[in-house]
Amino acid sequence: DSSVGGKTAVNLEAGKNLWGAFKQPILVLCDPATLNTLPDMEWINGCGEIIKYGFLDVPGLLTQLEHKPLIKHRDSISTVITRCVQAKADIVEQDERESGVRALLNLGHTFGHGIEKASHFEVHHGYAVAIGMMLMAQGAVKHGELDVEALEKLKVLIKAHDLPTTTTISKEEILAAAKHDKKSEGATIKIVVPTSYGHSELKVITHEELATYLD
């Protein structure tokens, strides 16, 4: 996933991906056969990002994942990779430097990065993104932006891929880390909110308002 889009970034003590640049690769080679060398934990880890794409208007992806969870149907990985890579490429072509629509790719990452940092990166990225999506979706329900049925379907899908939906990390720790997120500017932060099953939207809110998504 990170090979497509041209971002080159490093993690700092204050948070993830805070220092970087844009450099498009000459070639991206996707060889699904190499995934056979991965332990189950890393397969599950990758599914967090894949489920994210299902909420970015990728036609048919959620239905495919519902009927054939990747954990049990690994033979479908090539089709899934193709859909996700094409979706990201389409978004990046519209907004290479992330001044607009590309920020949608951060669904689940605001709270997810906070969880990673607060856990001292013991929680792997895909696991954190899954929890981050769930927390944001729960907040969206509280704010009247998402219906409960969509939230429950997301929860079922995440669990079907053996990913977590909750964390023992405190709200205060997550928010403290989120304030240093690269999408944070001054007193505001740009978040990605799921507004229906399969669709998400960008929203700029204050840090105080962000806290209400975790209440």
Task: Give the ranges of each region predicted by the language model.
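Histidine kinase transmitter module recognition
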Residues: 35, 53-54, 121, 143, ...
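C-terminal charged capping/lid subdomain of soluble metabolic enzymes
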Residues: 48-51, 145-215
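A glycine/threonine-rich phosphate-anchoring loop and its flanking beta-alpha core
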Residues: 1-68
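Active-site segments that bind and position negatively charged phosphate/pyrophosphate groups
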Residues: 63-172
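A generic structural signal for well-ordered coil/turn residues at beta-strand boundaries
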Residues: 6, 23-26, 101, 187-188, ...
